[in-house]
Amino acid sequence: MPIKLAQTNKEIKTTFNPFWSAAVVNEKNNWKNFKKFSAIFIKVIKVFIFIFLTIVGLWGCTQTLAQPWTGTNQVLGSGLEIGYKFGTTGDYRYDLISNNFGPYFTFSDYTLAYGPFYGWFVWPAAQIVLPIMYATRVPLGSGVELGFNMILSLIVLLLLVRLITIVITLNSTLALEKMNEVQGKLAEINAKYKGAIDLQSKRNRQLEIMSLYKKHNIKSSAAFVQVFVTLPIFLIIYRIVTTLRPIKAIILFNFWDLSKVPLTEIFSNFTTTGWPFIIFLVIVLPVQFLSQKLPQVWASKRNENAKAHSQKSIEQLNKTKKMQLIFYFVFAAITAFSAAGVGVYWFLNALFTLLQSYLTHVFIVKRREKRKQNYSKLDLILERE
């Protein structure tokens, strides 16, 4: 009798829910639908963010041509300035006051009167830099202000920006690494359809490349995303270093007036205040160049065994190098023709780029070594079996 009862219980357990399979299928379908909806929702959010940043970024670029108050004037007390209300600190370097020469526009409280770019981006970033500079300043009459407070505040701002964008930067770098790793297979696909001019062959080639990218989870837009995010950040910090009153008042190390334009000073006042800016450019420009060159060198070392063999891939690589060279000359021109404060920002930003690129390089190398060790362990297990 107990045996029969146990058998009956077993049968009841196995046949308790006749709709169990259907429930599992429905649950899986619901999960798939949820994943599809989530993916679509995330894409829509990304598109919205990109459109928003594009509009605001273009606004920030073009409003200088449309609005007179956005024209930066590096003379203290002229143009648009961000600082404290007159009489707040009693320090002329921080309190907003006109020099009575030309138009003057004060930005001491939050407002959208100067446009969304200034209100939503420049103002919040300035509220990080301004209090740090004031708290670490050399008080009037207590000594010479060498500008260490400005360097500290920009380092804090750049660190916060890097922490916010590190996920985007790392994903972009890893995506480019994956693209380098599959260059050999990509070269095989290109060689397979070499010389093919019919529409079907071109379509098949494109489908195979898309399949390869999908298999390795590669997004070809990764590099574009990084550039897209970097440009608005540059515009924000550019506006800060050209409109923040205490930065305009600084003579860095009692040697470089950050309100001056290096190239203008070199050609206009070479014997007095101009020649120090030659040293300034000699320091800043090579560091900018290294911040672009060294990451390429590290990437080449990582991908020595994964280089492309197709002529088309080599041509694409050469185009990339040319574009990077063009960018370098553009940045060099901006440094030479903008206020020296912009050059200080580029210098610090280049140092951050070098540090982040090196840490990313070490991370990728260690991750690859770990993968190799795991593969080696798996091979040993398979051999034993």
UniProtKB/Swiss-Prot annotation:
One of its GO terms (cellular component) is plasma membrane. Pfam families: 60KD_IMP (PF02096). GO terms for molecular function: membrane insertase activity. The chain crosses the membrane at residues 39-59, 112-132, 150-170, 222-242, 247-267, 270-290, 325-345. Disulfide bonds: none annotated. Keywords: Cell membrane, Chaperone, Membrane, Protein transport, Transmembrane, Transmembrane helix, Transport. It is found in: Cell membrane. GO terms for biological process: protein insertion into membrane; protein transport. InterPro entries: YidC/ALB3/OXA1/COX18, YidC/Oxa/ALB_C, YidC_ALB_C. It is a multi-pass membrane protein. It comes from the Bacteria. Interacts with the Sec translocase complex via SecD. Specifically interacts with transmembrane segments of nascent integral membrane proteins during membrane integration. Required for the insertion and/or proper folding and/or complex formation of integral membrane proteins into the membrane. Involved in integration of membrane proteins that insert both dependently and independently of the Sec translocase complex, as well as at least some lipoproteins. Aids folding of multispanning membrane proteins. Belongs to the OXA1/ALB3/YidC family. Type 1 subfamily. This is Membrane protein insertase YidC. It comes from Mycoplasma genitalium (strain ATCC 33530 / DSM 19775 / NCTC 10195 / G37) (Mycoplasmoides genitalium). The lineage of its organism: Bacteria, Bacillati, Mycoplasmatota, Mycoplasmoidales, Mycoplasmoidaceae.
